[in-house]
């Protein structure tokens, strides 16, 4: 069908949103250190960071474009030893003293930073989680002794990855971190702070490890973010305050509620208005209206759309350099907005967001004009969960509201995304008015959200999906590739195998519970756990057992590659996915040969 894009010009559901905001009492708002002095109200519903050191200004531009560090993120994670005013005064003096030579060189800038800044991550401290125990009960659910050792090692990594922000010895505004009240688990390596969507899998792993106190503390942190900013930022740094990430908070709360057997009603009562508030943010600031050219019917779906007209501070050099491909301010602004929106998607970056005519070239990025299948699948599941939560608390009118929202979304997704020939769901491009029919793991994510129960898709039709994808789902020893498009600069493509996507693929396959889908799912679970186990085992003596951020589909136990930084170890979401699978399927997992 032919759809024409219309930008939403009015605030949706304003009455409900106003009610929710008014009824957030002070008792529900935790104390967090104020960072509002460095925020301004930006487009797209976020308060963009205006910090003169970490987000804007000559100092940031000079440091990043000189490439004092190989990784642009290093500088913006370095706390200041003295006030903003002093740092700027000293920097201006440096510029004056070196003006005859064309400005400071890399060595002079490095010396300036050493004198006036602490090392990156100085204010982030390890902490021992209060609820960690050496022998969690889930280990009894695993049959293979090798996998028991593997699981115990992963469980032990929570001790290595749990952090707190400690800014007590730093001056006001002298750091980029967003302080929170409770300990949190980081991803690892360069990712020194908490991240929004990573935490969905981290929290699942914590719940498997019986660490409900730590998990609940992280949920409270996110609730505080929504109360403070209206949404959950990409991560725990002020330079992330112009964007969010895939909205998985509602599903995190649901996982906690399930793990505690629905007993923590008091917490649900506390957090539900905040979940409502986040939902309304996404429905107010991240929507597009599409009209059916044949029937005139309009539908509303969500997309990533960050208002941004400058390089991301943590990737300043890369963004600035790429933007030089454009001659006009309008083109650069579109690029910067789409780059930030690609980061908001979590898939930073993928051919999904590129121009169909040149989909391996990052400078063709057009994320703001792509309506994604996975985002709308996430929100569909959120709507069903929110309806259930409100029904649990006796809020029948809100339960009916969310049920209606989910039904409207299913109808819209079927109209806009569904391919009747392949039985897959494909992203929709607003510029070309066409669907992207290439294979991506996101193509079957609606099955994870159990859309099949709402559209009367029978088991035979579901099996047709998996049979048509058998060459992708079972052909690679290291797991299911993100796409079949190869581009070295696009890490969310090609042969990279990402833990969150493997989780979603496995759950999408296992949710329908057909004989064929269960067979395919079992095969994939075995391959995925094998590649993680082998990567861990081969580095056990030298590195203590490495858990990578991503893996290579072609090889067992080998990390993936590409993108803006080297492959990372740790790793929060890998640990969470593996613990979840080891508990759920631990009695039946078969390790393949390394």
Curated annotation (Swiss-Prot):
Q: Which residues are glycosylated?
A: 56, 70, 97, 166, 242, 261, 305, 361, 395, 513, 537
GO MF annotation, one: alpha,alpha-trehalase activity
Q: Quick check: keyword Signal in the entry? A: yes
Question: At which positions is substrate bound?
Answer: 190, 197-198, 234, 243-245, 312-314, 346, 564
Task: Enumerate the active-site residues.
Answer: 348 (proton donor/acceptor), 549 (proton donor/acceptor)
- Give a Pfam family name: Trehalase
Stretch forming the signal peptide? 1-27
User: What Gene Ontology terms for biological process does this UniProt record contain?
Assistant: trehalose catabolic process
Q: What is its EC number?
A: 3.2.1.28
* Reactions catalysed: alpha,alpha-trehalose + H2O = alpha-D-glucose + beta-D-glucose
Protein keywords: Glycoprotein, Glycosidase, Hydrolase, Signal
Q: Which InterPro entries match?
A: 6-hairpin_glycosidase_sf, 6hp_glycosidase-like_sf, Glyco_hydro_37
Q: Does the keyword Ubl conjugation apply?
A: no
Q: Which family does it belong to?
A: Belongs to the glycosyl hydrolase 37 family.
**Full protein name:** Trehalase
Q: Which gene encodes it?
A: treh
